[in-house]
Amino acid sequence: MSPMNAFDPQAEDSTTTIGRNLRSRPLARKKLSEMVEEELEQMIRRREFGEGEQLPSERELMAFFNVGRPSVREALAALKRKGLVQINNGERARVSRPSADTIIGELSGMAKDFLSHPGGIAHFEQLRLFFESSLVRYAAEHATDEQIDLLAKALEINSQSLDNNAAFIRSDVDFHRVLAEIPGNPIFMAIHVALLDWLIAARPTVADQALHEHNNVSYQQHIAIVDAIRRHDPDEADRALQSHLNSVSATWHAFGQTTNKKK
C-alpha cells in the first residue's frame, strides 16, 4: 500500500493503519518552562516587548502563565542563552537583540564535543580552510588600502612575537581576525572567532622550543598571503592561504602524534 493509500478513508484497513502510525509517533510532552519560553519568545518577536524594554516581574509572569517560579526562571534563562533577554541581579529581564556571537556561542558545546571524536579536528580544519579561502579571495579583490595597512600592522606584530609563543599565538589569531573583518560581516567574525577558539583549545600542549620553528614558518606564510592581497591576486592569495593552513594542520598533527607516544 502506498503512503497515500494508507490514509485513504475508503481503504479497508485505514483505521488500523492510522492507529498504528499514531502509536508509532507519540507526542513529546513539553515542560511548563518550555511552554513559557516559547510564548515569551513569540511575544518578543511580535514586538509586544520592544528592544530595551523590561519584561514583567517574575511574580507577574507566574500569575500570567499560572506556573511556579522555577518554570519562569528556567524560561528566562533559556531566552538569555538565545540572546533575547539580559538578566541582571535584582532587575527584571530586559529584551535584547541576539548578536552573531550569541548565535555561534549556542553551538560551542556541540562543537567541542564533536572535536573530541575521531576525525573531528580534521573536519573543523577543513571547514576553516574552505572559510578562510573565501576570505582571502575576497580580501584580494576588495580590500581597501586602509584594510591592507591593518594586515601589514598585524604582520609586524607577528614578526615581533616569534620568540614568545603565547604572544605569537595571540598575534597569529589577530592576523587571521583582520582577514575575517575585511568583508564587514559580523556573522563571519563570530564564526571565525569561535572556529579558532575551538581548534586552539583542541591542540596538544607542546614545549616552547618545539614551536619556535613553526612560528617562523607561519610568519613567512603570512607574508606570502599579504603580498598576494596587496597585488590584488585572489588565486595567489588562495594558494598561499591553503599552503599555510595545510602546513599548520600537518604540524599540529605531528605534535599530537609525538605527544600521544610519550603518554
Swiss-Prot record:
Recorded protein name is HTH-type transcriptional repressor NanR
Q: Which SUPFAM superfamilies match?
A: GntR ligand-binding domain-like (SSF48008), Winged helix' DNA-binding domain (SSF46785)
Is Transcription regulation tagged as a keyword? yes
Which Pfam family, just one, is annotated for this protein? Answer: FCD
PROSITE patterns xrefs: HTH_GNTR
Q: Name one GO molecular function term.
A: DNA binding
Which NCBIfam families is this protein grouped with? PRK03837.1
Ranges for the HTH gntR-type domain? Answer: 30-98
Native organism is Escherichia coli O1:K1 / APEC
